[in-house]
Amino acid sequence: PRPLVAASAPQVFVQFAHVAMHLSPERTVEVGAATVGIACTYEGRPGHYVLTMPMEGEFVVIGGREKFGEPKKIAETKFRIEGDRVNAQVIRHGIPFLELEGRIGGESDGPKKFTEHLFCYKAMPSCQPEKSTNGGFDGDVLLTQLNWERDYTSLRRLEEGKIILRESARDPLVDIPVKRILRMEYAEGASKTGGEVLCSVP
């Protein structure tokens, strides 16, 4: 959607994460999460337009939606490692609509320290849409940019990788064809997340 511009290659970013959120020295909350985005640019800056962010934990979902406009949904996630095999699933309404699996291989030649940019739209639906002069919203629709600063301690290839999409009326990712996997990796380390408002969208 404008003002984002589709990337020259139709590529999709899929991430599964098992996150330990250090809310205070005494309190750490662990959640599972996934992010799916489409490659795009904003004023020449590469990133991904976020299609969905299913994750565990109501407070995490509400906070991300209200602050950054992230399209988060409450979901069940499963992430397990057995030997050198990795399997991750996202489940909503009893359907494992997104699944990833692979075998942990050798060190990847990808970067361990970098910043990723993702784009979202933050908007407040109007309580009186029939009277709205702004397309059914109260106030401006804002394009936001998420800035994820990665600092990995380990980055390894995932061999024999698969991404499995299943039919779900509420989560229709299966409509996106998986033609080939360009790169799949297993990372350990830390991420510092933040964001900013880029512009109002008329």
Model-found features: residue ranges?
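Homeobox/homeodomain signature
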Residues: 4-6, 64, 69, 153, ...
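N-terminal start-of-chain detector that recognizes signal peptides
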Residues: 6-11, 51, 60-62, 155
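Aromatic- and glycine-enriched beta-alpha-beta binding-site module
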Residues: 21-101
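N-terminal ordered "arm"
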Residues: 1-20
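Interaction-surface and assembly-scaffold signal
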Residues: 71-202
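Intrinsically disordered, low-complexity boundary segments flanking structured domains
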Residues: 1-5, 25, 37-39, 151
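A short linear-motif detector with a strong N-terminal bias
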Residues: 14-18, 30, 67-68, 142-144, ...
